[in-house]
C-alpha cells in the first residue's frame, strides 16, 4: 500500500486512515510496510539532482498566469540557466514518440515535445509532482503493471518518458 500524499496542503485530515480502513473493509491486508510519499521527499529531490546532473531538467520561473490557457509549455525558461531555488523544475520533453497499449483503451501514442511539452517535476512551492513520485516508487517497489482510471490515462506517457530518462526497465 502506498499513500500518494506529496501535495500536503491538499490532504484532508483523516483521509489516510479512511483509505486504510476501506482497504481493510474489502478484506485486503498490506503485504509490506505502508509507504507514505511525504516521508520520501529527500529521495525525490535526489532523483531531481540526478536528472539535473544529466542536464535533463531546468528551473522555470513562469507562473500559471503567464502561461494562460496554453497547456503545452513552450520552453521559455529552458535555456536561461536559472537557479533551482524557489523555481519550478521542468523536465525537457524531447521530440520522441511515446506509445503504450492499454488493455481497455487500446494503443496510445504521443509526440512528447509537441503534445505534452516540458512538464513540471517540482512546483515552485517545493511540492513534488505526482509523475515523478509514482515513477520512482513504482520502480523501487517493483511495480510493472498499473490499473488506472481513464481520467488518468494521459499521465502514462509522461511516466514512461521519466522511466526512460532514469533508465528504469
Regions found by a protein language model. Give the residues of each.
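Active-site cores that bind ATP or allylic diphosphates and position pyrophosphate for catalysis
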Residues: 59, 64-169
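N-terminal Rossmann-like or analogous alpha/beta NTP/dinucleotide-binding catalytic cores
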Residues: 1-72, 151-168
Amino acid at each position: 500500500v502506498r499513500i500518494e500524499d506529496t501535495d500536503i496542503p491538499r490532504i484532508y485530515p483523516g483521509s489516510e486512515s479512511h483509505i486504510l480502513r476501506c482497504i481493510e473493509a474489502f478484506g485486503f491486508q498490506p503485504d509490506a510496510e505502508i509507504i507514505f510519499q511525504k516521508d520520501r521527499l529527500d529521495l525525490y529531490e535526489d532523483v531531481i539532482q540526478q536528472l539535473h546532473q544529466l542536464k535533463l531538467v531546468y528551473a522555470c520561473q513562469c507562473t500559471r498566469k503567464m502561461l494562460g490557457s496554453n497547456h503545452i509549455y513552450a520552453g521559455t525558461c529552458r535555456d536561461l540557466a536559472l537557479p533551482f531555488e524557489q523555481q519550478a523544475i521542468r523536465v525537457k520533453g524531447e521530440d520522441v514518440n511515446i506509445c503504450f497499449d492499454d488493455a481497455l483503451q487500446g494503443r496510445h501514442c504521443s509526440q512528447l515535445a509537441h503534445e505534452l511539452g516540458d512538464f513540471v517535476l517540482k512546483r515552485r512551492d517545493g511540492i513534488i509532482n505526482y509523475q515523478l513520485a509514482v515513477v520512482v516508487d513504482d520502480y523501487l517497489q517493483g511495480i510493472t503493471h498499473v490499473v488506472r482510471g481513464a481520467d488518468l490515462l494521459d499521465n502514462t506517457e509522461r511516466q514512461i518518458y521519466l522511466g526512460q530518462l532514469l533508465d528504469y526497465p
